[in-house]
A protein has these predicted regions:
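N-terminal signal-anchor transmembrane alpha helix
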Residues: 1-17
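Membrane-interface helix termini and inter-helical loops of multi-pass transporters
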Residues: 20-34, 65, 149
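Helix-adjacent hinge/juxtasegments
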Residues: 50-88
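Membrane-helix boundary connector in multi-pass membrane proteins
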Residues: 91-96, 113-126
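Juxtamembrane boundary at the C-terminal end of a transmembrane helix
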Residues: 139-150
């Protein structure tokens, strides 16, 4: 499943910005009460990226049967993935909590659009993205709380 591997590799590139910000700056922030320990994020994102890769594969294999909807779905997926990586760059790399909140808001909307577009091609692909939407919803709440507290 090349799609899973590619999504994992591209997704892991956001860890560069995360690692940059996890030093003294992040440690100095007032943390929301519901913020999980830092070690939780790696395994969760690894699982989510694998699920995203599986969803991409399901859509990709339908590209000849449904070229218009599949191409649209993959394009929207690519757009949301750019915003996923941008959030790490803005929140951790640039240390801009408020701007991160704006980015994650756009990301959330693009994930909803991706789920809708994937559902038009393969319902299973859309379902595979639901945990991702739930996690980003939680991450947006955390981002908001970091913004309020700091």
């Amino acid at each position: 499943m090349l799609a899973v591997l590619l999504v994992e590799i591209v997704g892991a590139s956001g860890a560069v910005f995360t690692a940059q910000g996890l030093g003294a700056w992040y440690a100095s922030l007032e943390r929301p009460a519901v913020a999980p320990p830092n070690w939780v994020f790696g395994p969760v994102w690894t699982a989510l990226f694998a699920s995203m890769g599986g969803a991409v594969w399901l859509v990709w294999r339908r590209i000849e049967a449904a070229p218009g909807p599949a191409r649209l779905a993959l394009g929207v997926f690519a757009a949301q993935f750019v915003f996923n990586l941008a959030w790490s760059a803005v929140f951790f790399g640039m240390r801009e909590i408020g701007a991160g909140l704006a980015v994650i808001g756009v990301l959330w909307a693009l994930i909803v659009a991706t789920i809708w577009a994937f559902d038009r091609v393969d319902r299973r692909a859309a379902i595979l993205l639901v945990p991702y939407l739930l996690w980003v919803t939680f991450a947006a709440y955390l981002n908001y709380q970091f913004w309020v507290l700091n």
